[in-house]
Regions:
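Bacterial N-terminal signal peptides
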Residues: 6-15
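Accessory "access/gating" subregions that flank catalytic or transport cores
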Residues: 35, 144, 152-161, 170-179, ...
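Active-site cavity-forming subdomains of large catalytic enzyme subunits
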Residues: 41, 49, 91, 98, ...
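Mature, well-folded catalytic/scaffold domains that follow N-terminal targeting or propeptide regions
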Residues: 44-45, 101, 119, 145, ...
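Catalytic phosphate/nucleotide-handling subdomain of diverse soluble enzymes
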Residues: 53, 57, 64, 68-76, ...
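Active-site-surrounding "flap" and adjacent substrate/cofactor-binding loops of secreted or lumenal enzymes
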Residues: 59-100, 117-123, 127-130
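Acidic, carboxylate-rich catalytic segments that either coordinate divalent cations
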Residues: 248, 252-284, 340-420
């Protein structure tokens, strides 16, 4: 097993090739896919509508049940939790709005291969607080301070690298590469790596692959079998040592062996016991917005939903944890598979709103109130470019002629890697506070808690390890803290920031990477001014074998 502790090792792994596709025999005949652009335009409208219905259906239960007792099917229905169908316009949320920003960025730069600098520029212009969380928020703060993707996702810079974020912000890259998951992975790689790394990266790629394959899935199969085929293809991408692979395999086996395919709750409860209440496959549950637990939950709704839009979204909304995210992912995929018109039939509703209010969550967009029809038309223009210039295909009348992938999807070629950084929250009982108080419901902060203090506040934490980092919230109200390690002062550090009225979360204020393995202490001492001092979290390396 490879241990990952340093920035340099992280960068080495980050730059390993995508593991695109295995070489095929030279004499293998390459056939073409023919995909009708008018039909695909309908599918893109279905993607946007399906994502929004599912997103807003899942939002009321988001983080409402993150442990036993969970919701069940009996909690869903009229006068309970129910499908959300009547928004006008549809409100943007983080499950759709960052994908919208990526589409805008591709249009703006006239390039489907966005660079790290372009991603950073568009994030800083359009994406920000208050509607931003965990890894997305950590990545934005780094970009504001000069770090460029993919370095915004490595564990040394982003303690939220293993959260769900990329799973809800990058599916659109699969939609942009119909029938060619290899191309989808290429164009989506840097957007994924803006916020995700290793396991969370492969969870996001799993969804991207399924979105891409939805354009060429065998139409003679039942919807259930179509979903299973796409999922099995996506599973090939994930290294067997990853907990994402273990979660897919566990849920798939539980589904296959369950004689009552309506009893999805049984598998959900088994997932909670295996991954939340125990440590398995290298996964240790941290937060209800973990990549891992929500990926497992998504596979439950995927399999038990059996390709039925309503059933899949209902299960996703009731499954628990960060429930609006898997629902939005599958709502978008099934919306593409069905197409806009079939979604209308599903709900016996022909008057869905077409408007999309991106200004609800994102700033400075050229079209603050957009609509699915135009968004889909612009998506077709992007795909035209990708088909010709990335796939080597052509446009013939109303059809794309797309060369078939020359080989099968293969596993990401990354050796088994252990990320050694371990999070210590500000509400950990081992902290010794004088003048600091850990406050709940700080939803933008790590673990939704944030310790605050003012004049002459002090904090001390003892830990065993070889490296540590101190993360804090900086704002216009921020003061100055002195950092001492084992009684030795390392200077004064400002927590003042004027990048925006909402400040910056997940800011790495200080790090010490060359400690001798053993027990150490960090002291954080506020100055005498009545300004705000904060502690969001520590990140430490405990394992002596991971010493840098």
């Amino acid at each position: 097993m490879k241990y990952l502790g340093s920035f340099f090792l992280a960068t080495l792994i980050a730059n390993i090739a995508l593991g695109q596709m295995t070489d095929s025999p030279e004499n293998k005949e390459i056939t073409n896919y023919q995909i009708n652009r008018n039909e695909y335009r309908n599918k893109l409208r279905g993607f946007w509508l399906g994502s929004c219905i599912a997103n807003w259906t899942g939002l009321p239960t988001e983080n409402a049940r993150t442990d036993f007792p969970f919701f069940t099917d009996s909690d869903f229905g009229r006068d309970k939790y129910d499908y959300v169908l009547d928004q006008n316009p549809w409100g943007a949320d983080d499950d759709t709005d960052i994908e919208y920003v990526y589409q805008h960025a591709i249009e703006k730069y006239n390039s489907y291969m966005l660079t790290g600098e372009q991603i950073s520029a568009e994030w800083q212009k359009h994406i920000g607080l208050p509607k931003l969380w965990v890894s997305n928020l950590s990545a934005l703060g780094q970009m504001q301070n000069g770090t460029i993707p993919p370095h915004t996702s490595v564990p040394e810079n982003n303690p939220m690298w293993d959260m769900i974020d990329a799973q809800l912000t990058t599916e659109i890259f699969g939609a942009f590469a119909p029938g060619r998951p290899d191309i989808a992975l290429e164009i989506g790689h840097l957007p994924v790596r803006t916020t995700a790394y290793l396991h969370s990266e492969w969870a996001a790629e799993f969804y991207i692959i399924m979105y891409s394959l939805s354009a060429i899935v065998d139409k003679s199969l039942s919807r259930k079998d179509q979903m299973i085929w796409m999922a099995e293809q996506a599973r090939k991408r994930v290294p067997n040592w990853s907990y994402i692979a273990d979660m897919y395999d566990f849920v798939k086996e539980a589904y296959d062996n369950n004689p009552d395919k309506d009893n999805w709750e049984k598998t959900r409860d088994e997932v909670a016991k295996r991954y939340q209440h125990s440590i398995n496959a290298g996964y240790e549950y941290k937060y209800p917005w973990d990549s891992g637990i929500n990926f497992a939950a998504s596979i439950i709704s995927l399999l038990y939903g059996e390709g039925d839009y309503k059933k899949t979204i209902r299960i996703g909304a009731m499954c628990g944890w960060d429930s609006d995210n898997p629902t939005a992912t599958w709502g978008g995929l099934l919306g593409m598979l069905y197409g806009y018109k079939e979604l209308q039939i599903q709900f016996n509703k022909t008057d869905f709103a077409d408007g999309y209010d991106i200004a609800r969550t994102r700033f400075n967009m050229p079209i603050p109130l957009d609509n699915f029809t135009d968004m889909s038309e612009r998506g077709i223009d992007i795909i035209n470019d990708i088909v010709v210039n990335a796939m080597g295909g052509s446009i013939e009348g109303d059809n794309w002629i797309i060369p078939q992938m020359s080989s099968e999807i293969t596993q990401a070629s990354v050796p088994e890697t252990l990320v050694s950084w371990h999070t210590i929250e500000d509400n950990d009982p081992k902290w010794k506070y004088e003048g600091f108080v850990s406050l709940n419901e700080n939803w933008n902060a790590s673990g939704a808690t944030l310790a605050k203090g003012y004049a002459n506040c002090t904090a001390e934490f003892n830990f065993t390890g070889t490296a540590m980092q101190y993360y804090a919230y900086r704002s216009p109200r921020g003061g100055v803290v002195k950092i001492l390690i084992d009684g030795v002062s390392y200077g004064d550090f400002s927590l003042e920031d004027h990048s925006g009225i909402h400040g910056q979360y997940y800011v790495k204020i200080f790090e010490k990477l060359d400690l001798t393995y053993g027990t150490h202490s960090i002291q954080i001492v506020g100055d005498a001014n009545d300004t705000e001092k904060t502690i969001d979290m520590l990140s430490i390396i405990e394992d002596p074998d991971s010493k840098e």
